[in-house]
Amino acid sequence: MKFHLWNAAILSATLVACAPPQPPVLTPDPVTLQFLDISDWHGQLDPLSFGSGDTAYQAGGAAVLSVYFKQDRAANPNTLTFTAGDDTGGSPPLSSFFGEKPAVEALNLMGLDAATFGNHNFDGGLSPLQGLINTAKFSYVSANLTNLDGNLANVKPYRIFTVGGVKVAVVGLTNPEARELVSPTAFGSILITDPVAAAEKARLAAKAEGAHVFVALTHLGVTSVDATSKAPSGPLIDFANNATGYDVIFGDHTNVQYSSTFGKTLVVENLSKGASYARVQLTFDRNNNTVLQSSNTFVIPKTTAVTPDPAVVAQLAPYRTQLAAQLDTKLGVATDLFPRANNNERLGEVALGDLVTDAIRARYGTQLAVVNGGTLRSPLPSSYAPLDTTLRRPGPGYQSGPPYDVVAGDVYSVLPFGNSVVTRTVTGTQLYAVLENSVSALPGSSGRFLQISGFSYRYDVSKPVGSRVVSVTLDTGAPILKDAATYTLALPDFTNAGGDGYTMLADGQGTSRELDAQVVLDAIKTQGTITPNPNLGQRIKAVTVP
């Protein structure tokens, strides 16, 4: 035993003697870097309205955000500004009617440095997206898109910025399911790989180039928060738990405000459309190449606190003038708001969903109509800003309501994607599969959740995915069974092509009709006055079945 201990002592001494000398700890040289981030902006060029009565306020909009960002940069010039996908796509008419060019031009003026891609960046396909990339004065980065050659140019996995004497690597990551959330041809031959593996590969490459701070722009979000433990879940949390070596991870995609630390990594997601933005402070020791601390503050960019940036106002003015001739036409009157908030249209029946699906079903005389919750992008009336200030509108600068005047721009804000309605038949068996997909993500929110008309159904979220639908009933009271009986259905062409996981419908059936926005626009003109359904919860009900 003594012999073994003596040998061990010699071995230990030898290892100590052979170990490489540790670099001396130098006197700290701290610098604070600032990162600004907006999530899921969707070309929201105009401010949004929040609250009511004495608590009402407006926030966001390109000209307002631009001033806030300038103030932040004046306070700390060592600043980078980001967005983590869906900066365009699903946008209000002021951007969408001009191919999203106004949004990218505004982001240039707002001083954006880098962005990644979300699914909505691909809404128009590759050629329009390439045009926007070429218009951008900032960098688009995504490390988990492959086969870019021949599809998209000027897209790199990451970009290294030197800020405050520190090399900061900004790595982009696209949500893996993005291909199924847009038209099947929108990505060309581009494939999406695992974000964790791609993030590690990009980080190591950037590190080899001398980067010391690592930021991930991910189009990944928090999908739910446990009511009891308050523990979050979702792709952003999964990524944060598995990615290594990142100092800040920005999330996106789900319109959830979240900020926490995972070990030494700060993880942040904002509310969408500029309702809030993240202001991250990261202190880095330049002598010892270590992050000393990081923190985040959510900023609500209220319109009353600043004067809008005149450069952005001027940039948007010609687009507004062109748009007014098409979309300022008054269609009718809404007796109250048709709200869109808190992802409710992705969780249950909402008045806006009833309005749209009822209009589509009435237009084509089908028994059933469905629309993905993710199709509905704005309340009604919307943030669209007609030039006529005598109209009754929710925001400042107009006559007050309710009732509210509804214009064509509102409808195109609610339904900006240019989807055509398709009419077809489905069997009872197919309809059950459709509804199972609709409720598959619950209790988390998902754009696949369907708003419906012409029927009702009950589901039990405690049951396994694929076995949650309990019963389906026509408005006539007749039950729909899981059998070969057929029913007529109207739905968006995106859904009929298998988007959002509706592969059971991608069988080549269906007759293409008019644009969904045109159908709803005509319905409001015909009705004259529209009222939110006061009996929500009758079409879609959660139940518990023993």
Question: How does the language model describe each region?
Answer:
Residues T14-A17:
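C-terminal motif of bacterial Sec signal peptides marking the signal peptidase cleavage site
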Residues M1-N7:
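Bacterial N-terminal signal peptides that target proteins for export
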Residues A19-T307, A311, L347-A359, S440-L442, ...:
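Acidic, metal/ion-coordinating pockets
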Residues L11:
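N-terminal glycine-rich, Lys/His-bearing helix-loop that initiates the first secondary-structure elements
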Residues L26-I38, Q44-Y68, L181, A186-V196, ...:
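Catalytic centers of hydrolytic enzymes
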